[in-house]
């Protein structure tokens, strides 16, 4: 958040969490970075408020669902009425469950020119890294592709 040229950094970051304590912890970490990037911390659990926040984002923004909603708890942090900024990146970190945020982003992908990223691939990267460490094996790109193909067959159904 501070080493890149100013033109390569976000003009602002908005972080929404249902728990003020988590926001406070994140604020303390960000303060150590001495960044000039403006960060807004919003304590909120109402998806309609998140819809309003979403509508205020600039085109080509990065929108990440790291809430666990759609995986650990039902729902999505935004409602079906929420509109993603044109050309934005919608990144669903969840890899299982109902994946409401992913479904919502996919529904708007064509019309809003969204770049939608599914957390499944990142989940696999994490697990394969653990396998490399625990079993002292190297998983190169070819092995990763083979393991991913097998894992994809076992993936729970959901939006893609």
Pin down the residues of each PLM region.
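A short, charged, Gly/Pro-tolerant segment at domain boundaries
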Residues: 141-160
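Rossmann-fold NAD(P)-binding glycine/threonine-rich loop
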Residues: 70-146
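Rossmann-like NAD(P)-binding element
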Residues: 15, 19-22, 40-78
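Conserved S-adenosyl-L-methionine
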Residues: 2-12, 35, 108-115
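NAD(P)-binding Rossmann-fold cofactor-contacting core
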Residues: 7-37, 44
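Alpha-helical membrane segments in multi-pass integral membrane proteins
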Residues: 13-16, 62, 88-95
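A general structural motif
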Residues: 10-12, 59-60, 85-87, 113
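Hydrophobic packing residues within well-ordered alpha-helices of enzyme cores
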Residues: 1, 23-26, 101-105
């Amino acid at each position: 958040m501070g080493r890149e040229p100013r033109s390569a950094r976000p003009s602002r970051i908005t972080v929404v969490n249902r728990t003020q304590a988590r926001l406070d912890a994140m604020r303390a970490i960000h303060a150590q970075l001495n960044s000039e990037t403006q960060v807004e911390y919003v304590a909120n659990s109402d998806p309609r408020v998140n819809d309003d926040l979403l509508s205020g984002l600039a085109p080509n923004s990065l929108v990440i669902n790291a809430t666990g909603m759609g995986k650990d708890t039902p729902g999505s942090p935004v409602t079906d009425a929420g509109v993603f900024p044109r050309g934005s990146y919608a990144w669903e970190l969840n890899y299982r469950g109902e994946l409401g945020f992913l479904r919502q982003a996919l529904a708007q992908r064509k019309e809003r020119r969204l770049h939608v990223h599914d957390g499944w691939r990142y989940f696999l990267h994490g697990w394969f890294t653990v396998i490399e460490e625990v079993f002292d094996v190297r998983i190169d790109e070819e092995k990763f592709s083979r393991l991913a193909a097998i894992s994809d067959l076992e993936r729970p159904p959901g939006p893609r």
